[in-house]
A protein has these predicted regions:
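A conserved regulatory-domain signal marking ACT and ACT-like small-molecule sensing domains
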Residues: 1-343
């Protein structure tokens, strides 16, 4: 990547509560959780859920004013599962077009802010990070190192242009709702590998370098989320790359992160949908998870952020999953993408 890469822009949603939970029991926990939030009309502008060793970990965001209500519902429904709570903001950079070098540069920027816990989700249109409120201003300024954003030459230029837009942004978050959610289309691809990497915040810069190395091979990143870890100070990244006989992904990770715990799942498929919705929008994720459950699809990971939903599951289940999605969403087109290599 060039010293400074031109992107479309970035957005920040402030005044949010970031909640992280882990449920070691119950493979239907994400569906039960999403159903609970939807029944109470609690919007989730950011949600990731990932499975590992039969335990589900979720990162989610609610409006700051809904924090107490959300926590009360969680405790009442699921008991004492010790949710972690942070006041923060969602930073979304777009478009990154599934390019690992964009993810790598963002990891590098955020990793240099110190040993911080950060939640990530990507889609074909954007990569989003949930940050603690104490580092959001520093993170915003640091973006202008590796990236250029249209007419905004400096952080001050960008901040001036954002005045008065925060309320409009919040109105879009929770005002749009339909009986059958519409999306612009569904894309999917198989022949993917799902990698699980456990690392701490201090290793984010090195993980960024790993993604830049993936980019040098011309690889396309079709799925990426983070999930919380039971180990203090650690987190888990889950991401998909094309299946490859010549590229040893685990070896590339271990070269820079020898202490990182890495697991690979082969023969998975990823899907993505873009639409006019924002985040969960009062139940989109709930409807999707119920449909996938009825189709007996073994979801491995999911994200719902900004205008996109992405997910990953075993390749052999992708067709039944697509049928389930078409049953609960208005999907005008379904497109299979072949595993891509940019070189």
């Amino acid at each position: 990547m060039d010293a400074s890469t031109r992107l479309g822009g970035f957005k920040i949603l402030n005044e949010v509560a970031w909640i992280s939970v882990i449920q070691p029991k119950g493979h239907k926990f994400p569906m039960a959780f999403a159903n609970l939030m939807a029944s109470e009309k609690l919007n989730l502008p950011f949600l990731t859920c990932g499975e590992q060793n039969r335990a589900w970990g979720l990162h989610l965001v609610v409006d700051a004013q809904d924090e107490k209500r959300a926590l009360g519902l969680i405790e009442k429904e699921f008991g004492d599962i010790n949710p972690a709570i942070t006041r923060g903001a969602i930073l979304s950079v777009f478009p990154h077009r599934s390019r690992p070098e964009i993810v790598g540069a963002l990891f590098d920027v955020l990793g240099k802010l110190g040993d911080q816990q950060i939640a990530f989700a990507n889609s074909p249109s954007a990569i989003s990070a949930v940050l603690g409120k104490d580092i959001i201003n520093e993170a915003t300024s640091a973006l202008f190192g590796p990236f250029r954003f249209g007419p905004y030459r400096t952080p001050a230029d960008w901040k001036l242009a954002q005045k008065g837009k925060e309320e409009l942004y919040k109105e879009v978050v929770a005002s749009y709702q339909e009986k059958k959610p519409k999306v612009y289309g569904l894309e999917w691809q198989d022949k993917q590998e799902l990698l699980h990497v456990k690392l701490d915040g201090a290793n984010l810069v090195n993980m960024g370098t790993v993604f830049k190395n993936f980019a040098r091979l011309g690889l396309v990143l079709t799925f990426l989320i983070s999930r919380p870890s039971k180990e203090k100070g650690k987190g888990n990244l889950l991401f998909c790359l094309p299946e490859s006989e010549k590229n040893n992904y685990t070896g590339m990770i271990k070269k820079l992160l020898p202490e990182a715990s890495t697991v690979e799942d082969s023969s998975v498929a990823s899907f993505s949908m873009n639409g006019p919705h924002f985040g969960d929008r009062y139940g989109i994720t709930s409807e999707l998870l119920m449909a996938l459950d009825q189709a007996c699809a073994d979801l491995l990971g999911l994200s719902c952020s900004i205008h996109s939903i992405t997910g990953v599951l075993p390749s052999k289940q992708i067709h039944s999953a697509i049928e389930a999605i078409q049953g609960c969403f208005d999907v005008p087109s379904v497109i299979k993408r072949e595993p891509q290599n940019l070189l």
